[in-house]
Amino acid sequence: MKVKTILVSQPEPSNEKSPYSRLEEKYKLNINFRPFIHVEGMNAKEVRQQKIDFNNFQNIILTSRNAVDHFFRLCKEMRFAVPDSTKYFCQSEAVAFYLQKYVVYRKRKIYVGEKKIEDLEAVFKKFNKETFLFPTSDMLKPDVPDFLNKSTLNWQRAILYKTV
């Protein structure tokens, strides 16, 4: 039995020098690209309906690159200038490095965990009197909210994007 068609669950590569194009030519295959998960940002009106005012939060908890993108996109859309004093708590180093796209990277205001949100527990205890914003998708595993509740932090979840 010979394979004629391959389904790849990611967006189609923009350049022609991708390994997929070489596979197509070499083995005369038909490769279909269909992303199974699509992330759609919410607009400012939908965020305001959640009664979220970005001015009320000194700290932002970021768990993914999507959260970073949509938080800063909505800040721009709502004409909110993020203060320099804002502290960012990133679940992993990858998210922290991605944050450089929007913020000047200074060690004193970006706190990084190793892989899990629990890695930041000691840092959260230092700032337990301040308010935290937690930008998320509409679908969220209960692990992080359970941990934040257990840590007795003053935090609020903001649904900034939807997984379709």
PLM region spans:
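Conserved beta-alpha
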Residues: M1-V164
